[in-house]
């Protein structure tokens, strides 16, 4: 049977993979956004696991809020990336960093 520890280990592995993805690839903005989304999904998995283990629905409510914020963040982030790519013809973090005033 799959217990709480299995879900927590899986959530920790997903979180660690996303942290490694952020630290190893700091050039491409799309990969950074995907790593942040993976991090949020790992947190959601832990919330769901604890919610099921404790028989409390508060964790599931938090997951809905996190998914809503993550969807809005993805939509806004991708819209900004499309505008930057149209203007600069690149999505490299170093080139976008040169936009500072």
Swiss-Prot record:
Domain of life, source organism:
Bacteria
The membrane-spanning stretches of this chain are 4-24, 30-50, 61-81
Provide one Gene Ontology cellular component.
NADH dehydrogenase complex
The EC designation for this entry is 7.1.1.-
Annotated GO biological processes are: ATP synthesis coupled electron transport
Q: What is its main location?
A: membrane
Enumerate the InterPro entries for this protein. NADH_UbQ_OxRdtase_chain4L/K (IPR001133), NUOK/Mnh_C1-like (IPR039428)
The record's GO molecular-function terms, alphabetically, read: NADH:ubiquinone reductase (non-electrogenic) activity; quinone binding
Task: Write down the chemical reaction(s) this protein catalyses.
Answer: a quinone + NADH + 5 H(+)(in) = a quinol + NAD(+) + 4 H(+)(out)
Q: According to Swiss-Prot or TrEMBL, what is its membrane topology?
A: Multi-pass membrane protein
- Could you tell me the keywords of this UniProt record? Cell inner membrane, Cell membrane, Membrane, NAD, Quinone, Translocase, Transmembrane, Transmembrane helix, Transport, Ubiquinone
Compartment(s) of residence: Cell inner membrane
What NCBIfam families does the annotation carry? PRK05715.1-2, PRK05715.1-3, PRK05715.1-5
Q: How does it assemble?
A: NDH-1 is composed of 14 different subunits. Subunits NuoA, H, J, K, L, M, N constitute the membrane sector of the complex.
Cited PANTHER family: NADH DEHYDROGENASE SUBUNIT 4L-RELATED, NADH-UBIQUINONE OXIDOREDUCTASE SUBUNIT ND4L
The function of this protein is: NDH-1 shuttles electrons from NADH, via FMN and iron-sulfur (Fe-S) centers, to quinones in the respiratory chain. The immediate electron acceptor for the enzyme in this species is believed to be ubiquinone. Couples the redox reaction to proton translocation (for every two electrons transferred, four hydrogen ions are translocated across the cytoplasmic membrane), and thus conserves the redox energy in a proton gradient.
Q: Which family does it belong to?
A: Belongs to the complex I subunit 4L family.
- What is this protein's record name? NADH-quinone oxidoreductase subunit K
Q: Which organism is it from?
A: Methylovorus glucosotrophus (strain SIP3-4)
Question: What taxonomic ancestry is recorded?
Answer: Bacteria, Pseudomonadati, Pseudomonadota, Betaproteobacteria, Nitrosomonadales
């Amino acid at each position: 049977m799959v217990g709480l520890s299995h879900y927590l280990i899986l959530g920790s592995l997903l979180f660690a993979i996303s942290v490694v993805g952020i630290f190893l690839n700091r050039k491409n903005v799309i990969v950074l956004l995907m790593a942040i989304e993976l991090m949020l999904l790992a947190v959601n998995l832990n919330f769901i696991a604890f919610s099921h283990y404790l028989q409390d629905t508060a964790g599931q409510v938090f997951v809905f809020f996190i998914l809503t914020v993550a969807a809005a963040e993805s939509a806004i982030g991708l819209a900004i990336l499309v505008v930057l790519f149209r203007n600069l013809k690149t999505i490299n973090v170093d080139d976008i960093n040169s936009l500072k005033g």
